[in-house]
Amino acid sequence: LCIFLFSVASQSIFSNTIELETLIRNDEGKLAIVVDSSDPNISNLARRAFALHGGIVVTEELVEALFFVKIEPAGDSSALLTLGSGQPYTEQLRRTVSGRDLQNAVLRACDMVVKATLQSEGFFAGRLAFVCKQNGFSELYTSDLLFTRISPLTADRALITGPKWSPDGRSLLFTSYFKSGFPDIYRIDVDSRRKTPIATFKGLNSGGTFS
């Protein structure tokens, strides 16, 4: 049994974390788009991403869509995005989007669609930080938004709470009962997984956040 305790932050398609405003829409207020690709994996990935957005709905009928989105592979870690609308069709955006890999590039392209059509920041290419508690122990993990690539950051077999992203999205602050058995604050580099103690004073150290 694995219990997920989420303290989730998203990393933007750029280096900095972003704050997303609450957006509530009725179905009739959603932006209808058509998504196409010669690669079925890319098409499915883009559709899964857009399905998470409250302001966009993917339709199969071109006549019902305000925009036509086409995403094609352009290398191992890049995708070609074209965006257009109208009858007759008019191309409005063409961009080669690079990423850490092809999947990340496709999600970044989806973020560009959100920015171009809704004038708001996308979040599909972000990374999530969360705590998973299993067998009485909790560890810190990161994942892409669709949970297709989950990576452990710690293996301490200790209670962990409250991960917080740094402003540049490269590290996390969290509270851990590692070593002392009492709550201490640590900072961990997401790429190297190097952990640094920040606050290990006597008493309770918790709730660390970046200012």
Task: Mark where each language-model region is.
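A structural "domain/chain start" motif
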Residues: S12-R48
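Amphipathic beta-strand/beta-sheet edge segments enriched in Tyr/Trp
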Residues: R47, V63-M112
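Conserved blade-register residue in beta-propeller folds
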Residues: L83, Y141-T142, R187
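Conserved beta-propeller blade repeats
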Residues: A116, R157-T175, K195-T196, T200-S211
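Residue-level detector of Asp-centered blade-edge/turn motifs that repeat once per structural unit
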Residues: S120-F124, P167-D168
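A flexible loop/linker signature enriched in serine peptidases of the S9 family
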Residues: E121, C132-L140, R157, S176-D184, ...
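Residue position within the beta-strands of beta-propeller blades
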Residues: R127-C132, S171-T175
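Short loop/turn segments that connect beta-strands within beta-propeller blades
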Residues: D144-T148, D189-R193
